[in-house]
Amino acid sequence: MILMRAPIVEVFSSIQGEGLLVGRRQIFVRFAGCNLNCSYCDTPESRDPSAGRLFTAPELTEIIEGLITPDFHSISITGGEPLLYPDFITELLEESPHRTLLETNGSLPSNAERIAHLFDYASVDIKIAEHFSDNLRSGTTESDISSPGDLIDREIQVINILISRGVNTYCKVVVMPTTGAGYIGALAERLLECVDEPERLPLVIQPCSPPEQWAQNTPRLLEMSQEAGKYMDVYVIPQMHRALGLR
């Protein structure tokens, strides 16, 4: 039998520094290849599929099991964009006894439909227009996304798929000092209107790194939180692993 292989940039154990599982010890499996071209990406090396080493699912499972510590909480399937590899992820996780987190840009609803049942938690990264300084599509991975509007429609589809499958889901939006509070409020209002069960979807506002650029802009974060809070349960959580010097 020929085993599937997928390009993996790295597998490592660390503390989750983002979102609602912040502080949890996780084993991170970072897939190579991404279909988007976000200006703030903190792992640009993972955009190119050729950047990863090819692994089979049994090879990855052996590495994961060797990294488990007494404080281990869950496996984070991240990237890049892991939804590019639904068949491989199915092979990797369908027999796994461990809790799992999917970290995704939410751009591939049909693939999310195929593997949502494999996850306990999901973080869907909502993209806004200012995240893309040029073309929103990655030049290294094929994509048929036509515009930021098309992208957010897909992200909402993925959120609804995950919630309907019982996955503990939150959405995250990375903000910059230039991001308007009204824009974030309008985004939260749209999520309230379009998500099937919005009461099950918290919104995490994540200030982009480095944190020093926010020294004179903390009132803006409070304004964003206040505007989003009119519609959703909202958190403001920076990248804690960056502050601690962790991966």
Swiss-Prot record:
InterPro entries: 7-CO-7-deazaguanine_synth-like, Aldolase_TIM, rSAM. The keyword Membrane does not apply. Residues 21-247 form the Radical SAM core domain. GO terms for molecular function: 4 iron, 4 sulfur cluster binding; carbon-nitrogen lyase activity; magnesium ion binding; S-adenosyl-L-methionine binding. [4Fe-4S] cluster binds at C34, C38, C41. Keywords: 4Fe-4S, Iron, Iron-sulfur, Lyase, Magnesium, Metal-binding, S-adenosyl-L-methionine. Binds 1 [4Fe-4S] cluster. The cluster is coordinated with 3 cysteines and an exchangeable S-adenosyl-L-methionine. Binds 1 S-adenosyl-L-methionine per subunit. It catalyses: 6-carboxy-5,6,7,8-tetrahydropterin + H(+) = 7-carboxy-7-deazaguanine + NH4(+). Its EC number is 4.3.99.3. Homodimer. This is 7-carboxy-7-deazaguanine synthase. It comes from Methanothermobacter thermautotrophicus (strain ATCC 29096 / DSM 1053 / JCM 10044 / NBRC 100330 / Delta H). The gene is queE.
